């Protein structure tokens, strides 16, 4: 009887590890070394820690499992999981533990094998930010921006009206001060 209990416990541990290994957020954290040089070892330790957490707390709620996993990811991998996968993984782990508690080894094996079959390799790629773009490309390209100006609630077609002169003292603009872009060069009075 003790052998069957140990075997079930080992099966639950293998199922937990399979679920964690299939978790894209953890895969990305390990692949990119978010946990430092020992990221792989931390991921392996994480499986044992989660398994032990379930054994020490037999009647866990889903949000408790989510919080525990979220804390582990933050503390060990400096990662905040925001892709919506945290509740899914927590639910899988909780379902596995319920199968373990009922002694339903067949369901536990089936669930672990399904997770292993569906496991896919993910890779994170960084998107270039505005500061990382090539400066040569910026100098050679012309960027256009469409602006809709409002004048007393009525939208105009991307053209802002020129300000009206405010009176007879208004400064007259010389034609050479208007650049071809439509910008006006403002000069200080001497």
From Swiss-Prot:
GO-annotated biological processes: maturation of SSU-rRNA from tricistronic rRNA transcript (SSU-rRNA, 5.8S rRNA, LSU-rRNA)
Pfam family, one: WGG
Function: May be involved in 20S pre-rRNA processing.
Protein name: Pre-rRNA-processing protein TSR2 homolog
One GO cellular component, as annotated: nucleus
Domain of life: Eukaryota
Cell wall biogenesis/degradation as UniProt keyword: no
Protein family according to the UniProt entry: Belongs to the TSR2 family.
Chain segments carrying region Disordered: 152-176
Annotated source species: Bos taurus
Keywords: rRNA processing
Keyword rRNA processing attributed: yes
């Amino acid at each position: 009887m003790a052998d069957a209990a140990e075997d079930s416990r080992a099966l639950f541990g293998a199922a937990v590890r399979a679920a964690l290994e299939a978790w894209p957020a953890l895969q990305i954290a390990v692949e990119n070394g978010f946990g430092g040089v020992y990221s792989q070892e931390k991921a392996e330790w994480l499986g044992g820690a989660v398994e032990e957490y379930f054994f020490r707390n037999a009647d866990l709620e889903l949000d408790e499992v989510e919080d525990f996993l979220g804390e582990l990811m933050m503390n060990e991998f400096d990662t905040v999981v925001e892709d919506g996968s945290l509740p899914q993984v927590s639910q899988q782990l909780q379902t596995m533990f319920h199968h373990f508690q009922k002694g339903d080894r067949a369901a536990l094996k089936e669930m672990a094998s399904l997770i292993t079959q569906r496991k896919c390799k993910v890779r994170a790629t960084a998107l270039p930010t505005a500061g990382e773009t090539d400066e040569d490309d910026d100098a050679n390209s012309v960027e256009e921006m469409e602006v809709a100006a409002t004048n007393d609630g009525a939208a105009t077609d991307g053209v802002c009206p020129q300000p009206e002169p405010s009176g007879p003292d208004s400064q007259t603009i010389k034609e050479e001060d208007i650049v071809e872009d439509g910008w006006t060069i403002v000069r200080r009075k001497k």
